[in-house]
């Protein structure tokens, strides 16, 4: 598949304008409780996002169109899920690149872009439609594990909490803020390590970084990881890194 090819999927046509989702705080709170009791229950993340995100996806798409290469990215409409499931493509990335780090991460953690997408389809059926906003929502979903690499946050409980705070700063999606706040409140009484400060730093790092949703990820994955972080103004996760892995 070339850089400009798009993924062919049986997405339902969007024959009517997508409605702005109504925020459902009760649904979000129940899902947050389930997520905090089991961080591996990824489906609850999509429940929360669907309940709280409102029109943030539409706003993100419109913002993309105002960026230097956003018009091209929107026109090409590459489906990152399929690109990230191409094992031969992932194997082509040289050591030290963002792509190599992503490849090693998902394989060592037994993750896949398709696995994450399948969970989202179970919880958010409208993400399947053939509509620019839905495509942008899929794109945002599919870069989550790449953001793990760029941010330096691992998949432990604290790392996920820091990354959702980082993601809120990047996307403005209220669901991310809700999850980050829940995680921070849960760790507030644990004074041995700076958990809340690390989560807050995640937000500040996301705010200081360039807008990652405007990136051409097929190109970004070829960049050396350290150089990409410098270009994108992603500072070190100093507080997170200061906490022993066993305590995260």
Sequence positions of predicted segments:
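Sequence termini and other peripheral, non-core segments
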Residues: 1-82, 88, 225-248
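Core of folded catalytic or high-affinity ligand/protein-binding domains
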Residues: 43-223
């Amino acid at each position: 598949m070339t850089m400009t090819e798009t993924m062919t999927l049986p997405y339902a046509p969007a024959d009517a304008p997508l409605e702005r989702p109504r925020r459902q705080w009760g649904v979000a709170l129940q899902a947050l409780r389930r997520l905090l009791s089991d961080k591996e229950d990824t489906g609850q993340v999509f429940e929360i996002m669907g309940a709280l995100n409102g029109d943030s996806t539409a706003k993100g798409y419109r913002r993309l169109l105002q960026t230097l290469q956003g018009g091209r990215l929107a026109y090409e409409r590459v489906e990152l899920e399929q690109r990230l499931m191409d094992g031969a493509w992932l194997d082509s990335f040289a050591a030290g690149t963002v792509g190599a780090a992503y490849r090693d991460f998902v394989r060592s953690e037994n993750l896949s872009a398709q696995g994450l997408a399948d969970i989202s389809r179970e919880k958010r059926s409208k993400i399947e439609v053939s509509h620019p906003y839905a495509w942008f929502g899929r794109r945002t979903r599919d870069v989550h594990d790449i953001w793990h690499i760029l941010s330096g946050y691992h998949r432990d409980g604290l790392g996920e909490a820091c990354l959702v705070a980082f993601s809120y700063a990047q996307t403005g999606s209220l669901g991310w803020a809700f999850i980050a706040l829940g995680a921070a409140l849960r760790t507030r009484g644990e004074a041995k390590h700076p958990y809340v400060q690390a989560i807050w730093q995640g937000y500040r790092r996301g705010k200081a970084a360039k807008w990652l949703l405007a990136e051409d990820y097929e190109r970004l994955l070829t960049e050396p990881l350290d150089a990409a972080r410098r270009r994108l103004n992603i500072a070190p996760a100093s507080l997170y890194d200061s906490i022993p892995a066993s305590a995260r």
